[in-house]
């Protein structure tokens, strides 16, 4: 009887140790399973090329809503100050963007631009500007031009004769670009008209 009494506690401790080890393994397995499941559910982000997209051709001229005259589009790309964009989704997009070395606001390695309502885009939407020389400028919509400031097709800002305004940080913008108000001065290859705007069905979140 004394021997049996001595063996009982040892057996009980052994069982407790085994149960603890099994529980620990179960927790580890459960954790791994949950992590893997989340990874599968989230999945890798699909390439931009796989998103639906709409292409808009840009004409070489437009009619001024003020004078009624036909104005040629020479390819100008003006600038807009980011600090003045503080409203709604556009304000949020500008608040999380940062200027590059020339003072151009960028987000996700894309330039913030303001465009007219013709393109049916919203702040944060991905788009490409295709230039006449084949250069592609990767952009994200950072602001919407007011219809009152654009032509009847809501493509061009009739006062500046441009279809794309690059959003800049006026504290760090390159001096020559700021003084002339011409974003095309950033790169020699940008000095060409925009002939097409491609809007992707993807919005920065």
Where are these regions (language model features)?
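Solvent-exposed, well-ordered loop and adjacent helix/strand elements within mature globular domains
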Residues: 7-11, 17-205
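Sec-dependent N-terminal signal peptides of Gram-positive bacterial secreted proteins and lipoproteins
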Residues: 1-4
């Amino acid at each position: 009887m004394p021997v049996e009494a001595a063996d009982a506690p040892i057996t009980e401790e052994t069982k407790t140790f085994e149960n603890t080890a099994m529980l620990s393994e179960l927790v580890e397995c459960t954790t791994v399973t949950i992590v893997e499941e989340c990874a599968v559910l989230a999945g890798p982000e699909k390439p931009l090329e796989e998103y639906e997209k709409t292409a808009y051709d840009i004409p070489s001229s437009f009619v001024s809503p003020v004078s009624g005259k036909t104005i040629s589009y020479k390819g100008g790309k003006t600038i807009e100050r980011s600090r003045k964009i503080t409203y709604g989704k556009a304000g949020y997009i500008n608040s999380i963007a940062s200027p590059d070395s020339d003072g151009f606001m960028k987000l996700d390695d894309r330039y913030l631009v303001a465009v007219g309502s013709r393109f049916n885009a919203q702040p944060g939407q991905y788009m490409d500007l295709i230039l006449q020389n084949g250069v592609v400028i990767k952009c994200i919509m950072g602001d919407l031009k007011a219809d009152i400031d654009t032509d009847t097709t809501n493509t061009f800002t009739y006062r500046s004769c441009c279809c794309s305004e690059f959003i800049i940080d006026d504290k760090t913008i390159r001096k020559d670009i700021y003084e002339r108000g011409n974003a095309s001065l950033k790169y020699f290859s940008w000095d060409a008209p925009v002939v097409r705007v491609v809007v992707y069905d993807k919005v920065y979140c």
